[in-house]
Amino acid sequence: MTVFAAEQQFHDAERPLPSHQARLACRAGLAETTAGVAPGFVQGNLAILPEKYAAAFHRFCQLNPKPCPIVGMSDVGNPMIPSLGIDLDIRTDLPRYRVWRDGELVEEPTDIVAHWRDDLVAFVIGCSFSFEEALLADDIPIRHIEEKVRVPMYRTNIPCAPAGPFSGPMVVSMRPLKPKDAIRAIQITSRFPSVHGAPVHIGLPQSIGIADIAKPDYGDPVPIGPDELPVFWACGVTPQAVIAAAKVPFAITHAPGLMLVTDLKNKHLAVL
């Protein structure tokens, strides 16, 4: 069953919110991309760290609001974040996780119950899937949704401001757009600073350190038409890259493209 079919199935069930239904699907073992799931609701990237590193990571996010806009944070040792959703359990409610030890990816489980500890702090970081709803509403096509794959993401040569052990380059997501749509996309996404805001770069991927746009570092490649430009947004996978580079003894993140679906409304994130 695809995530799109599963979402429709849960829409038909007697559940209070599509976002809650999506989390229940993940809790039941569904492990697919969440792009296009629960339209209207905010999705988030995930970073979980021991309390020892939480303050420095929080500072890193404050210094780098484009790639790392925090939309929610747990109390120490508490896997529930009530401000983000009904019955939301950070240990079970994402499709897939990544477990890191000393900067190395060691496991990609569908839940982290066995890995949870009393000293962990969870950060939920804004995701570009939220502004995609606004783009679609303006008839701007989103290629990875059309192709039913994960958005392509790339490490760049754009530096992030360091904080404590956390430093490194920005990761960006890419959507191919025709020039007229790219201009409109800048206008639309500028209204959503808490989910990455306006693009950080348009065209010429080599100038931001992307050697081969057909080979993303995360996610899946998508076709780019001859009349289209690659448009790049700051991406919430950036924390994943800097956590790995910092080689902290233990950390957990989401698997790229497989996000936490919250009960927050996208429309409430717009600033204009």
From Swiss-Prot:
Keywords, ordered alphabetically: Lyase
EC number: 4.2.1.-
InterPro entries the record matches: D-Glu_cyclase (IPR009906), Putative_hydro-lyase (IPR038021), UPF0317 (IPR016938)
GO molecular function, one term: lyase activity
Keyword Cell cycle appears in the UniProt entry: no
NCBIfam families: PRK05463.1
Protein family membership: Belongs to the D-glutamate cyclase family.
Name used for this protein in its record: Putative hydro-lyase RPA1747
Native species: Rhodopseudomonas palustris (strain ATCC BAA-98 / CGA009)
